[in-house]
Amino acid sequence: MKENDVVLRTVTKLVVFILLTFGFYVFFAGHNNPGGGFIGGLIFSSAFILMFLAFNVEEVLESLPIDFRILMIIGALVSSITAIIPMFFGKPFLSQYETTWILPILGQIHVSTITLFELGILFSVVGVIVTVMLSLSGGRS
Protein backbone atom coordinates (compact mmCIF):
# COMPACT_ATOMS: atom_id res chain seq x y z
CA MET A 1 0.00 0.00 0.00
CA LYS A 2 1.35 3.43 -0.89
CA GLU A 3 2.06 5.86 1.91
CA ASN A 4 -0.04 8.65 0.35
CA ASP A 5 -3.40 6.88 0.07
CA VAL A 6 -5.16 9.71 1.89
CA VAL A 7 -8.57 9.13 0.32
CA LEU A 8 -8.55 5.39 1.04
CA ARG A 9 -7.48 5.89 4.64
CA THR A 10 -10.01 8.66 5.26
CA VAL A 11 -12.90 6.72 3.73
CA THR A 12 -11.83 3.59 5.62
CA LYS A 13 -12.13 5.38 8.96
CA LEU A 14 -15.72 6.35 8.16
CA VAL A 15 -16.70 2.98 6.67
CA VAL A 16 -15.20 1.04 9.60
CA PHE A 17 -17.25 3.14 12.02
CA ILE A 18 -20.39 2.45 9.97
CA LEU A 19 -19.62 -1.29 9.74
CA LEU A 20 -19.02 -1.60 13.50
CA THR A 21 -22.22 0.32 14.29
CA PHE A 22 -24.24 -1.81 11.85
CA GLY A 23 -22.60 -4.94 13.28
CA PHE A 24 -23.81 -4.02 16.78
CA TYR A 25 -27.31 -3.38 15.43
CA VAL A 26 -27.45 -6.69 13.56
CA PHE A 27 -26.13 -8.56 16.60
CA PHE A 28 -28.74 -7.17 18.98
CA ALA A 29 -31.60 -7.26 16.45
CA GLY A 30 -30.88 -10.91 15.71
CA HIS A 31 -32.89 -12.19 18.66
CA ASN A 32 -36.20 -11.15 17.12
CA ASN A 33 -35.24 -10.43 13.50
CA PRO A 34 -32.78 -11.81 10.95
CA GLY A 35 -29.23 -11.37 12.14
CA GLY A 36 -27.43 -12.38 15.28
CA GLY A 37 -23.96 -13.58 16.13
CA PHE A 38 -22.96 -15.10 12.82
CA ILE A 39 -24.01 -12.22 10.57
CA GLY A 40 -22.75 -9.67 13.11
CA GLY A 41 -19.43 -11.52 13.20
CA LEU A 42 -19.15 -11.35 9.42
CA ILE A 43 -19.77 -7.59 9.50
CA PHE A 44 -17.23 -7.05 12.30
CA SER A 45 -14.70 -9.18 10.40
CA SER A 46 -15.17 -7.11 7.26
CA ALA A 47 -14.41 -3.96 9.28
CA PHE A 48 -11.14 -5.45 10.57
CA ILE A 49 -10.15 -6.70 7.11
CA LEU A 50 -10.84 -3.27 5.62
CA MET A 51 -8.52 -1.73 8.24
CA PHE A 52 -5.82 -4.26 7.32
CA LEU A 53 -6.17 -3.38 3.63
CA ALA A 54 -6.05 0.39 4.11
CA PHE A 55 -3.37 0.54 6.79
CA ASN A 56 -0.28 -1.48 7.61
CA VAL A 57 -1.28 -4.84 9.12
CA GLU A 58 1.36 -4.63 11.85
CA GLU A 59 0.27 -1.11 12.86
CA VAL A 60 -3.37 -2.17 13.10
CA LEU A 61 -2.52 -5.29 15.12
CA GLU A 62 -0.34 -3.26 17.50
CA SER A 63 -3.08 -0.67 18.01
CA LEU A 64 -5.78 -3.31 18.64
CA PRO A 65 -5.51 -5.08 22.00
CA ILE A 66 -7.05 -8.23 20.44
CA ASP A 67 -5.48 -11.61 19.81
CA PHE A 68 -7.90 -13.09 17.30
CA ARG A 69 -6.85 -16.67 18.03
CA ILE A 70 -7.73 -16.21 21.69
CA LEU A 71 -10.96 -14.46 20.71
CA MET A 72 -11.89 -17.55 18.68
CA ILE A 73 -11.30 -19.82 21.69
CA ILE A 74 -13.19 -17.52 24.07
CA GLY A 75 -16.14 -17.50 21.69
CA ALA A 76 -16.24 -21.29 21.49
CA LEU A 77 -16.03 -21.54 25.29
CA VAL A 78 -18.80 -18.98 25.89
CA SER A 79 -21.14 -20.70 23.43
CA SER A 80 -20.36 -24.15 24.82
CA ILE A 81 -20.79 -23.14 28.45
CA THR A 82 -24.06 -21.35 27.66
CA ALA A 83 -25.32 -24.50 25.93
CA ILE A 84 -24.19 -26.93 28.66
CA ILE A 85 -25.24 -25.07 31.85
CA PRO A 86 -28.98 -25.90 31.53
CA MET A 87 -28.12 -29.62 31.73
CA PHE A 88 -26.96 -29.11 35.34
CA PHE A 89 -30.47 -27.90 36.19
CA GLY A 90 -32.25 -30.84 34.57
CA LYS A 91 -33.11 -29.03 31.35
CA PRO A 92 -32.21 -30.08 27.79
CA PHE A 93 -28.98 -29.03 26.08
CA LEU A 94 -29.21 -25.47 24.66
CA SER A 95 -32.25 -24.52 26.77
CA GLN A 96 -32.50 -20.78 27.14
CA TYR A 97 -33.57 -18.67 30.10
CA GLU A 98 -35.54 -15.48 29.55
CA THR A 99 -36.69 -12.78 31.94
CA THR A 100 -37.68 -9.14 31.98
CA TRP A 101 -35.96 -6.57 34.16
CA ILE A 102 -37.36 -3.15 34.98
CA LEU A 103 -34.56 -0.62 35.23
CA PRO A 104 -35.03 2.96 36.51
CA ILE A 105 -33.80 4.88 33.45
CA LEU A 106 -34.07 2.31 30.66
CA GLY A 107 -37.45 0.89 31.63
CA GLN A 108 -38.40 -2.67 30.74
CA ILE A 109 -35.48 -4.76 29.39
CA HIS A 110 -35.82 -8.27 27.93
CA VAL A 111 -32.84 -10.43 29.01
CA SER A 112 -32.08 -13.87 27.57
CA THR A 113 -29.17 -16.28 27.67
CA ILE A 114 -29.40 -16.54 23.88
CA THR A 115 -27.54 -13.21 23.81
CA LEU A 116 -24.53 -14.82 25.52
CA PHE A 117 -24.66 -17.76 23.12
CA GLU A 118 -24.79 -15.41 20.12
CA LEU A 119 -21.91 -13.35 21.57
CA GLY A 120 -19.83 -16.52 21.64
CA ILE A 121 -20.75 -17.17 18.01
CA LEU A 122 -19.78 -13.59 17.10
CA PHE A 123 -16.39 -13.92 18.82
CA SER A 124 -15.72 -17.25 17.12
CA VAL A 125 -16.65 -15.98 13.66
CA VAL A 126 -14.51 -12.85 14.01
CA GLY A 127 -11.58 -14.86 15.38
CA VAL A 128 -11.71 -17.49 12.65
CA ILE A 129 -12.20 -15.15 9.70
CA VAL A 130 -9.55 -12.62 10.72
CA THR A 131 -7.04 -15.35 11.62
CA VAL A 132 -7.58 -17.08 8.27
CA MET A 133 -7.29 -13.80 6.35
CA LEU A 134 -4.09 -12.87 8.19
CA SER A 135 -2.65 -16.33 7.51
CA LEU A 136 -3.50 -16.13 3.81
CA SER A 137 -2.07 -12.64 3.47
CA GLY A 138 1.21 -13.62 5.08
CA GLY A 139 0.66 -11.27 8.01
CA ARG A 140 0.94 -12.22 11.63
CA SER A 141 -1.77 -14.79 12.39
From Swiss-Prot:
Bilayer topology: Multi-pass membrane protein
GO annotation, cellular component aspect: plasma membrane
Protein's cellular compartments: Cell membrane
Transmembrane segments: 10-30, 35-55, 70-90, 114-134
GO biological process: monoatomic ion transport
Gene Ontology MF term list: antiporter activity
Keywords: Antiport, Cell membrane, Ion transport, Membrane, Transmembrane, Transmembrane helix, Transport
InterPro entries: CPA3_antiporter_subunitB, MnhB
Family membership noted in the UniProt record: Belongs to the CPA3 antiporters (TC 2.A.63) subunit B family.
Role noted for this protein: Expression of the mnh2 operon in E.coli is not able to catalyze Na(+)Li(+)/H(+) antiport. It does however confer higher growth rates than the control strain at up to pH 9.5. The operon may encode an NADH-ubiquinone oxidoreductase.
NCBIfam families in the cross-refs: PRK12573.1, PRK12574.1
UniProt protein name: Putative antiporter subunit mnhB2
Gene name in the database record: mnhB2
